[in-house]
């Protein structure tokens, strides 16, 4: 895969270990991802992997003007990791049968979640299924399509501030690197 041909404002000024993604940058990445997919593949529907993968999946589906569905695969319940390996918590949509499917997650690291989702979607018997993520790592699993390659810890706009004790606060995981 080639890296995106668009410039991301503010990207070069960020700490190398973290990539703080504001909503406008996320939108640009989704548009770039949708364009990359559309140049090579015409999915009939998009399946997003909950929880975070449904966000780029819904945006990409909207841009591509196709139906959107979700499935849930996770190691977590809420914000707490409760499993060593990801588990399928809601099945692949049966609407994928006989269709060209684009399977979307927010990031590909080890690829374990995407591989599990890919197998589950294939069990529904689509015509074809391809994978896409907003971000991919330089090493490890590569989806068929991704918007940006980085080894930085990605701070997604929906995870930057969280609801805690009755108010929105900077996510404690990122407080030391965010200027707020």
Residue ranges and their predicted role:
Residues 62-102, 112-119:
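Short, glycine/charge-rich flexible loops or terminal/linker lids adjacent to PRPP-binding catalytic cores
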Residues 39-42, 95-97, 124-125:
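Glycine-rich phosphate-binding loop signature in dinucleotide/nucleotide-binding domains
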Residues 1-43:
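Active-site-facing substrate-recognition patch
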Residues 45, 69, 102, 130-132:
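A structural signal for isolated positions on well-ordered beta-strands in alpha/beta enzyme cores
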Residues 52, 109, 113:
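Conserved glycine-rich SAM-binding loop
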